[in-house]
Amino acid sequence: MKYAIFCYHAENAVCAWSKEHDEAVMAKLMAVQEPRAKAGKLGPVARLMPTTAATTGRKDGEPVAVLDGPFAETKEQLLGFYLVDFDTLEEALAFARELSEANPGGAHEVRRVGFFVDWREAG
């Protein structure tokens, strides 16, 4: 079963990390990811740019409004995600727990994927 693991953190805290601290955190995360990748359980992994780089499309009528900037009203922002393929929710939660141990703060939301197509492979 495919699961999405969404990574949330206070963006201002992450952006304030020194380059050395950021590289150390990323190295810890890579160490958690590597065994899952070798086992064929880890799909795409993405670290998103800050919300200041976001553009939002909002449909409240016609036409769709395209707006610069983030509009989430949250204390933590979505900073990245993983797409994983585990047999059980417990396995996905265990992986999310390991990611949390490697990352100083934030939250990891695990959600089962309801629909998935990889258009690069569908053709």
Regions found by a protein language model. Give the residues of each.
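Conserved, structured core segments of small domains
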Residues: 1-123
